Amino acid sequence: MQSSGSSASSSRHVSIVELLSTPPNAGVPSNSAAPSSSSRVAAQAQVQSQSQSPKLSATAAAAAAATADNFGNGNSNFGQAGAGTPAGSHIHHGSDAESISSISSASTTSMHCPLERTGSGTGSGYVPGPNSDVPISPSLSAVDTLHSHSVSRTNSESSFDTQLSRIHTTKWQLIPLSQLVEQNKLIFIDGSISVEEAFNTLVKYNLTSLPVENSPDDIDCLTFDYNDLNSYLLLVLNKITVNNPEVTRQCQLGHPVPVGEIIKLTPKNPFYKLPEQENLSTAMMILGSGVHRVAITNQENTKITGILSQRRLIKYLWDNARSFQNFEHLFQKSLKDLKIGVLDTHTKPTSRQSRVISIQGDELLIMALFKMHTERISSIAVIDPQGNLLGNISVTDVKHITRTSQYPLLQNTCLHFISVILDKRGIEMGKDSFPIFHVYPTSSLARTIAKLVATKAHRLWIVQPSGDTPVDSEKDKRSGKLIGVVSLTDILGLLARHQTEFKRVDPLAARRQRGSIV
């Protein structure tokens, strides 16, 4: 990737212009300030005021594989800051990552991808420790041996989670947010740096998102994530149109585009902030409404001290479930009994269920990226003509098509792309990798959460097993007919309604605000 002011920019830009002069014909149609919330009541009103239409859509986020041998192990959602911070990024207190390198200038006979990585890196947004996004294959045996009605797990081996286990009370709702903030550094990036540099920072620190500052100590900032990267890729490839002619022109000429401009193109929720003395109940209400992360500030609300993501919260509750009241009863119930995520094809979905969005395995990968953009989701199920689940494509998988040599993947099938991803994981891990991203309507909430923690996914697809597959068999890599999806939002919304004072939390509120549901 090219840093600002690089002398190699001109040749790279020529190669992009050559690419744009012969765009692939995939048949694709053209196409906030964050309010401060220190009060639970004010926060609830703010989130619930966004809820409008009942039409449904699937929640999404990047599905990454992770070791399941010890569900208590994991890294936080910010990526540890290290030496060699890329130009344009600077360290405050916590953030997310992955890397883009410069686009090599080549002959006009070669197709070029707008982003290209030069090296491997690890990183995922916002916290080093309990919420890392490092893609690692899960141990299927560990997932398979989970008893569907057991809340027992191995506690986290990290000193951070061990410390939390010693200090929290039996009422998780009263735990102050300060107890979930690690004193590690957050990584912020400046809005003036290029999209390539921003992607480099994501990769470097193995993050999924980064706060973008317009000025030093700006706490009312938007975030850059893989949805923005997907939009940028589609814009460069002339597959979408936006209402900013100058940004469109710069993208299609191959000129560097400030990340601060790109993040404005994708609808986002406000950057919610809660003071560190606020308790977990309020954060649960906001995250259970579909907001993916909240910023935690000091008492004066002048400085961000950490970020709490949906995945970090789920992992924290799972690691410490034995210490909390009233979890066992909910954890033993099935998804069907809880009425979350499961879609009955004979009845109309409720306003608290997610709509399944899928694509056929023989459709082109570029169409999957386009569909995720237009539906404003971050993952999509891949199915066969009979509706059986074949796999999953996440918006974070865009990182696998940032090299010039990987560009032909866009014009290949979704099923082929899934095989490429699995092969890549197998090479990196030295063994076969086949993370199980599905559950059944009869799967318990405990098993579902365990799989979400083990795979570091944001959602699991719900399938109806074939007649010859026992409904309680979790060891079979085969899935079944896709009938639904259950997400982190669904689960956090359920916990908020059942175990906090916020009984009317709507898991689709944030999606409506982003325009994902009309």
UniProtKB/Swiss-Prot annotation:
Annotated keywords: CBS domain, Cytoplasm, Nucleus, Repeat
GO cellular component terms given for this protein: cytoplasm; nucleus
InterPro entries for the chain: AMPK_gamma/SDS23_families, CBS_dom, CBS_dom_sf, Ssd23
Residue ranges, compositional bias (Low complexity): 1-14, 23-54, 97-110
Any Pfam family hit: CBS
Start and end residues of each stretch annotated as Disordered: 1-54, 77-140
Family matches, as SUPFAM superfamilies: CBS-domain pair
SMART domains linked: CBS (SM00116)
Keyword Cell membrane: no
Localization: Cytoplasm; Nucleus
GO molecular-function term, one example from the UniProt record: protein serine/threonine phosphatase inhibitor activity
PROSITE patterns: CBS
Domain CBS, chain residue ranges per copy: 181-242, 265-323, 350-409, 429-501
The protein, known as: Protein SDS23
